């Protein structure tokens, strides 16, 4: 494993640990998800350039488009939650409440 791939896998693991241990605000969870998607995008783009295959050349762009959709949906849920509950605390969000 090269130094650069180790760096991106460490960034992914830090985002994953931040997502599992930081359970107070919805915004911090969304930022951890975005960091994970960014590290996956860069690692996938580097993998495609190292292998020099045309078969997977569109995979990083597809991942980037899906992460942009995820970011837009997450921000809209954040705004809806902040308007409905007054804060973005994850403890206040319970799917069993009306």
Curated annotation (Swiss-Prot):
Keyword Aminoacyl-tRNA synthetase: no
Record keyword Membrane present: yes
Localisation per UniProt entry: Mitochondrion membrane
Residues spanning the membrane: 1-21, 26-46, 59-79
GO MF annotation terms: NADH dehydrogenase (ubiquinone) activity
Entry similarity comment: Belongs to the complex I subunit 4L family.
Matches recorded under PANTHER family: NADH-UBIQUINONE OXIDOREDUCTASE CHAIN 4L, NADH-UBIQUINONE OXIDOREDUCTASE SUBUNIT ND4L
Protein name: NADH-ubiquinone oxidoreductase chain 4L
Gene name in the database record: MT-ND4L
């Amino acid at each position: 494993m090269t130094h650069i791939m180790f760096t991106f896998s460490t960034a992914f693991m830090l985002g994953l640990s931040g997502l599992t241990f930081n359970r107070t605000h919805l915004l911090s969870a969304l930022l951890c998800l975005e960091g994970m998607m960014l590290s996956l995008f860069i690692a996938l783009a580097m993998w495609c350039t190292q292998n020099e295959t045309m078969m997977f050349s569109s995979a990083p762009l597809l991942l980037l488009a899906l992460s942009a959709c995820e970011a837009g949906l997450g921000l809209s849920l954040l705004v809806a939650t902040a308007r409905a509950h007054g804060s973005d605390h994850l403890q206040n969000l319970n799917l069993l409440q009306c």
